């Protein structure tokens, strides 16, 4: 029989994402409504290792649902890969008699929760908090929709100036090795060309396509590309030399992570926060939460990381390509 849960801690780890505060708020208030004690860990796994644990109450999470970032703070802490570091983290949790941990973050954060579950049998629930939308077991991650809105707004503005100056604009969008954000932003922003990790970069094909469109009377172009695929400034120089059109690269960068979360992310994060507490109350641990076909679901976090694969959004890519 699972141990009764009386105290829960929550942390945010890795890159911040709009909606993390809403998720923290959901966990905190749901826990308090169940009569549980709730703690916050500042600065992610780094803070857990360094005993940065604070008690939380309802007022701790007042007026944060609309705020971007994470009021608990976040940090990347690669040292957590060391089992001795994880042992110390478990000792800190035991010091406060914390029975379970809710981790909000991306795949690196999930890996930390997986190891705590796998090695120590410690009850962890993972909530997908990343703008990259690259987490298995969920259609959407917390922060993705807000980042998409930010990217589309940037593309809209670039289209105005690109059209006016007959310019080629290259827009680098976050996502690491996942093209979801780029594909959706390209479709919503009407980009002429889409380059994502799942399909690769074929410069010759890109040049041929741009040349063909210019011959047909096209006077400008917007290229959406996922980060880390190439040096976009070098690509801009190559295209300008090839076509004689002014070509500029814009790296959206961390602006995509900031800003007030959109309603979708606030709702998703709040629902997931409540759901995480419900799962712990039901005796579940070692799970990761997702939303699939509009329904909240949970998966074994070890199985999810080891065996599940994130499907490529082929239908959206094809639609964006056909409409380019």
UniProtKB/Swiss-Prot annotation:
The catalytic activity of this protein is classed by the Enzyme Commission as 2.7.1.11
Q: Which gene carries the instructions for this protein? A: pfkA
Q: In which pathway does it act?
A: Carbohydrate degradation; glycolysis; D-glyceraldehyde 3-phosphate and glycerone phosphate from D-glucose: step 3/4
- Reaction catalysed? beta-D-fructose 6-phosphate + ATP = beta-D-fructose 1,6-bisphosphate + ADP + H(+)
Top-level division of the source organism's lineage: Bacteria
Its biological purpose is as follows:
Catalyzes the phosphorylation of D-fructose 6-phosphate to fructose 1,6-bisphosphate by ATP, the first committing step of glycolysis.
Q: What is this protein called?
A: ATP-dependent 6-phosphofructokinase
- Note the Gene3D superfamilies from the entry: 3.40.50.450, Phosphofructokinase domain (3.40.50.460)
Read off the HAMAP family from this record. Answer: Phosphofructokinase_I_B1
Care to name a GO molecular-function term for this sequence?
A: fructose-6-phosphate binding
Q: Which GO terms describe its cellular component?
A: 6-phosphofructokinase complex
Into which family does the record put it?
A: Belongs to the phosphofructokinase type A (PFKA) family. ATP-dependent PFK group I subfamily. Prokaryotic clade 'B1' sub-subfamily.
Q: What is its main location?
A: cytoplasm
- Name the positions where ATP binds: 15, 76-77, 106-109
EC class name: transferase
